[in-house]
A protein has these predicted regions:
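Hydrophobic alpha-helical segments within soluble ligand-binding/sensing domains
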Residues: 114-118
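Nucleotide and nucleotide-moiety/phosphate-recognizing core
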Residues: 1-110, 120-134, 141-147, 154, ...
Length: 192
């Protein structure tokens, strides 16, 4: 990882207000937390998203909330990364994960989409899966026959929302370690 490159941190979600607080918008919620902690206003509109830039502990950072809807997230991320000449290994994606309990973090340096359509779109548009991601546990469907779309677009019950909020400081620390070139340490400290 080259320290001279800008970092892009993208939180995935759906843009309409009716999706606020939904499981699928865990990435938006995480990005909002980082923006608040780092004092970065995410209010510029371009690249089919809301974005802002700043500096975090010596790292130039662009924060992005794609407004393309989840399944087309790459249509926002790839053009912004191209504009700022950000290589894929400096694109950190924050997204929901239905295979993890609420609040659990799963940090990976790269990998498949694992059935996540937002990640599929990003992989297609960036031309590969070599970008770090922090997957945020939102819990599994309560029953195998439960409609997946209804589950991920559903709102968090209060106890699950608290489980996520309690992990935002860990997610922030993990993001900083990734930018410091210490992804392995982020995994060992914060996965789970």
């Amino acid at each position: 990882m080259n320290a001279n490159y800008i970092w892009l941190i993208a939180g995935l979600g759906n843009p309409e207000a009716k999706y606020d607080g939904s499981r699928h918008n865990a990435g938006f919620a995480a990005l909002d937390y980082l923006a608040g902690k780092w004092g970065i206003s995410v209010n510029k509109t371009k690249f089919q998203g809301l974005w802002g830039q700043g500096e975090v502990e010596g790292h130039k950072v662009v924060l992005l909330k794609p407004l393309t809807y989840m399944n087309l997230s790459g249509d926002s991320i790839a053009p912004l990364a191209g504009f700022f000449k950000i290589p894929a290994d400096h694109v950190v994606v924050l997204c929901d994960d239905i295979t993890q309990n609420p609040g659990k973090l799963r940090i990976r340096p790269s990998g498949s989409a694992g059935g996540h359509n937002g990640l599929k779109s990003i992989i297609a548009r960036l031309g590969g899966d070599g970008f770090p991601r922090i997957r945020i546990g939102v819990g599994a469907k309560p029953h195998p026959d439960y409609d997946l779309a209804a589950w991920v677009l559903g709102k968090f019950p209060p106890e699950d929302a608290k489980a996520l909020a309690d992990r935002w400081p860990d997610l922030e620390a993990a993001a900083k370690l990734i930018m410091d070139g210490k992804l392995g340490l982020a995994q060992s400290k914060y996965n789970g």
